[in-house]
């Protein structure tokens, strides 16, 4: 006679897939696209042999075509990438430019980020956009007014923000700009493209952020009681990842390579865990500790790319239409704040 074993208790962890979050954002993007006279044209430049970059390019192409956007992938030798970007800057048929990094894996990549025309920079990597982001400036225009042009935020950090909004980590009772007040967040990655900008965005919205890389831990905050308009950075002398993790409600990790794993024992019970690396930074046991686990963010990043493309289109006033709803939803990070 077979023995009957009691049913195992259901997992207390909710796994949220990027595709689920992306669906709602895609609906907004479609609204914005439909009011334009012609589909915006995004051009991607691939100058490396990175399989992850090619996969991202393929996802971008599919998402564009499925949602009424034009997309062209241009594969060029890295020695020709500078001239290709300069030509794209003055091509009136191109509305947005994305470059799949890394190419040179050094300061040359940073230089390339700066030569993309600001009016076509869907990735938000131009100096003006980066300066505005760190200084918590949301507009390109200095004076208030109905025609103010909004600054572009980097795609991957903004994708994480959109996921946090979907997960209701942002407290909508609080005013815009303070909605992460009371949250303590760990960002494991301090790259200039993703990790540091993400820490700055989270801190500018009120969170206490521990930014971690191989050199140690930095704390990003707006000070006690959010007295500062934008974040400040303090070195946490002697701290390592294991010192920061137990304090954090949210853990966001994006370390490249298969060897790095977050120690599940260091996570707070009920933490929200988000992985933005191409590899899995969390072990399968994360579901035993986390309340919410997001294993990847790629599909959200691509939708954010299209939202940025719509915003560039709006900023350039090509079609003289009312700003697309896709980039104007109230209660989000990008909403108008008159303060």
List each language-model region with its residue ranges:
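Glycine-rich phosphate/diphosphate-binding loop of Rossmann-like nucleotide-binding domains
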Residues: 47-59, 141-262, 272, 288
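Positively charged, low-complexity intrinsically disordered leader regions
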Residues: 2-38
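Phosphate/diphosphate ligand-binding glycine-rich loop within oxidoreductases
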Residues: 70-156, 285-286
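Short glycine-/small-residue-rich Rossmann-like dinucleotide-binding loops
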Residues: 102, 254-257, 277-278
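Eukaryotic N-terminal low-complexity, Ser/Thr- and Lys/Arg-rich leader segments
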Residues: 1-15, 318-339
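Short beta-strand elements in bilobed, periplasmic/extracellular small-molecule ligand-binding domains
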Residues: 61-76, 209-213
